[in-house]
Amino acid sequence: MPGVLMMRLQRLRSLNMSEVLYEVIEPGIALITLNRPERLNAWTGRMGVEYFDAIDKAVADAKVRVIVVTGAGKGYCAGADMGTLQGIPTEKSSDGKDDSNILEGRMQDEITRISKPVIAAVNGAAAGLGLVQALMCDMRFAADTAKFTCAFSKRGLIAEYGVSWVLPRLVGQANALDLLMSSRVVMAAEAQQMGMVNRVVPADQLMDVVMAYAADLAMNVSPSSMSVMKRQVYGDYDKDVATASLDALKLMGQSFTRPDFKEGVVSYLQKRQADFPPVDPSA
């Protein structure tokens, strides 16, 4: 599948002028590709609209169980397009309102609240907004050639788009301050050591590894279980352990009433692959 998949993607990229490509691949993987390879997939307003349209499509599709995001060409996402940044007004408009809304819109933190797992396949440079997008995904697999940088401090900016929330949770406060203030470039091996990425693989194997992992989730794991677990991990972070434990008891009771539980037990006893239903909207 992976070799054929890459050929299909290359053909799609050559024929399609969209800034984001979307394809559903068996066994239920939505593949979202940032598609401005000539600009290292630098983020634009149009890309943002198309990206979240693709996310919405994947969430609404009962066949989709896992979402994978990657970049076309050599880069993952080089951050906000410099042409877009140069178009941002540096002064208030005449009516006293801030006119600098060119980069506004739906925010990357939405990814932490959707019901399906999102995996970033970081194939190259991830900088600024591109780094934030990857960090807001639930997991990150990186090519061994991938690079990461916050970049904001070297542009006279601040910790944007919620990176001050997500980065310390992944790498700790001291490392987060180092990366934010210095904007230094971090290679994939160091990023994994810090906890920024889950796994580093040879660049030519990245998509094979990611798609195999995503396929395992899609075929063998309860979508409703993944949805609840995702909500627990993000929601329980600031709770005390006693509250989180009590909440888990309630959620466990609810899980016993879903068909996923029966199917999980029966398929195990029958030594067959489970056939879980799509994610339960109430989960």
Where are these regions (language model features)?
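Conserved CoA-thioester-binding segment of acyl-CoA-metabolizing enzymes
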Residues: 7-72, 283
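Glycine- (often His-adjacent) and acidic-residue-rich active-site loop
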Residues: 49, 71-113, 126, 154, ...
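A general structural signal for well-ordered alpha-helical segments in protein cores
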Residues: 82, 104, 164, 173-176, ...
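CoA-thioester-processing core
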Residues: 107-115, 121, 127-181, 194, ...
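Well-ordered beta-strand positions
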Residues: 139, 178, 182-184, 190, ...
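C-terminal long alpha-helix characteristic of the crotonase
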Residues: 141-146, 197-246, 259, 275-283
